[in-house]
């Protein structure tokens, strides 16, 4: 079973922005790309870093580092220490515009 703690450890050097961006281009319907900040786990405990995932209804889809993590949003936010005020949300049409403009997968508006 894939554990969220393992995902958060790997994403510090992972492919989360690309994986989430690619997932958004494949999905149909109403989904949201999120660029946010998460708390590190394990070796990264005590550190916050940028991360990307996709939300659909009340589920987070985190396909970074070859994983296919799909968990309830409340659980993901609780374990990752995600705060809505730290996140940037992009509707279905926005990511492609940002990718073409910035020429990278993100983050685009986070410093």
Question: What kind of feature is each model-predicted range?
Answer:
Residues 1-3:
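Extracellular interaction modules
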């Amino acid at each position: 079973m894939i554990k969220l703690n393992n995902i958060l450890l790997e994403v510090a050097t992972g492919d989360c922005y690309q994986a989430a961006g690619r997932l958004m281009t494949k999905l149909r319907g109403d989904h949201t790309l999120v660029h946010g900040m998460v708390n590190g786990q394990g070796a990264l405990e005590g550190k916050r870093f940028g991360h990307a995932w996709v939300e659909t209804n009340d589920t987070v889809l985190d396909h970074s580092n070859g994983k296919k993590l799909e968990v309830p949003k409340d659980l993901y936010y609780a374990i990752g220490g995600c705060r809505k005020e730290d996140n940037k949300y992009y509707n279905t049409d926005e990511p492609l515009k940002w990718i073409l403009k910035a020429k990278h997968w993100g983050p685009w508006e986070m410093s």
